[in-house]
C-alpha cells in the first residue's frame, strides 16, 4: 500500500511538490489534497502518514508526531499570503469584531499575538469560511490566508492591510514558521526506511524547484491570476527549509502562544531519524 501524503492546495507549497511531477515520484505515493485545517485533521486522525500541517498543531499534538528536518513554509518578514484586512487601523480594533478564516490554525494564533502583544488590542473573534464579503458583513476586519489572501495583496482596494509575517518580524525580530512537515509517529517507527525515502524524494523535488523558479512561475500563471514575475517574487519571499534560526523563531512563537493559553506548554522539536543534507 502506498503511503498517504498530504498536500496543501496553496501556491506557497507548489515549490515543494512541483519536482515530484517532473521526477514521476508521485507514482510512489498517494497524494491527498486539502486546506491546512483539513490536512491537520486527517493526519491527527491517522488518515495520512505524512503531511504539512499548521505549526501550532504540531505543538498541540507532538506526542503523536515527529518532524521532517528540512521542510517548512516560513518567512523572514513579509509573507504576502497571510493578511489582516480591516475597515479600521489596527490600533483601533479593540472591541471590534474580527473574522478568522476557518482554513487557518497557526495564523489565528499569530494574529492574536500580534494584536495582544504588539498593539495591546483586544478584539472579539469569530470564525468564518474564507469569503471576504461575507466575513466583513459580520465583522470589522478579516484574517485571510493562502491564494485568496494573495489576491488581496495584489488588489488591496480600500482596506487597511497588514501582512502578519511583517508584523511578527516588527514585534519580535524573529523568523516565523507557519507550517511544518510532520510524520505520524507510529508510521515513522514502523516504516523508517519508507519515511527516509519519502524525505529524499521531497528533498530532490525542493532542490529541483529552487533551481527552476521561473519554470514553476510560468506553470502556475497558466491558471492563477498572477504574473510569472509576481509569482517568482512571492516564492522568493518564502522559506522552505528549517534552519536553526527558524527553529528558534518557532519555539519563541510557541512560548508566546502558551502565554495566551493557546498551548499548555512548549514542546521540543523532535525529528525523524534522517541525516539531512541541508545544514542547520
Identify the function of each model-found stretch.
Residues 189-256:
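Secondary-structure end/capping motifs
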Residues 23-32, 118-129, 263-269:
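A local structural motif
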Amino acid at each position: 500500500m502506498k503511503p498517504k501524503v498530504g498536500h496543501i492546495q496553496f501556491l506557497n507549497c507548489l515549490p515543494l511538490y512541483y519536482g515530484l511531477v517532473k521526477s514521476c515520484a508521485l507514482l510512489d505515493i498517494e497524494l491527498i489534497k486539502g486546506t491546512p485545517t483539513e490536512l491537520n485533521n486527517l493526519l491527527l486522525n491517522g488518515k495520512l502518514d505524512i503531511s504539512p500541517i499548521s505549526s501550532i498543531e504540531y505543538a498541540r499534538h507532538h506526542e503523536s508526531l515527529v518532524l521532517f528536518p528540512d521542510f517548512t513554509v516560513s518567512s523572514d518578514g513579509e509573507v504576502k499570503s497571510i493578511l489582516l484586512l480591516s475597515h479600521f487601523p489596527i490600533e483601533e480594533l479593540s472591541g471590534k469584531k474580527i473574522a478568522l478564516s476557518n482554513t487557518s490554525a497557526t495564523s489565528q494564533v499569530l494574529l492574536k499575538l500580534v494584536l495582544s502583544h504588539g498593539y495591546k488590542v483586544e478584539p472579539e473573534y469569530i470564525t468564518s469560511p474564507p469569503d471576504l464579503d461575507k466575513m466583513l458583513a459580520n465583522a470589522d476586519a478579516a484574517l485571510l490566508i493562502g491564494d485568496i489572501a494573495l489576491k488581496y495583496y495584489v488588489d488591496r482596494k480600500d482596506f487597511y492591510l497588514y501582512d502578519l509575517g511583517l508584523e511578527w518580524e516588527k514585534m519580535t525580530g524573529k523568523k516565523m514558521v507557519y507550517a511544518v512537515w510532520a510524520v505520524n509517529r507510529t508510521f515513522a517507527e514502523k516504516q523508517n526506511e519508507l519515511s527516509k525515502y519519502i524525505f529524499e524524494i521531497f528533498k530532490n523535488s525542493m532542490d529541483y524547484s529552487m533551481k527552476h523558479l521561473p519554470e514553476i512561475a510560468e506553470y502556475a500563471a497558466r491558471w492563477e491570476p498572477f504574473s510569472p514575475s509576481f509569482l517568482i517574487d512571492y516564492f522568493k519571499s518564502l522559506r522552505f527549509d528549517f534552519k536553526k534560526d527558524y527553529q528558534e523563531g518557532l519555539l519563541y512563537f510557541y512560548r508566546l502562544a502558551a502565554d495566551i493559553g493557546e498551548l499548555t506548554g512548549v514542546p521540543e522539536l523532535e525529528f525523524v531519524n534522517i541525516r539531512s543534507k541541508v545544514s542547520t
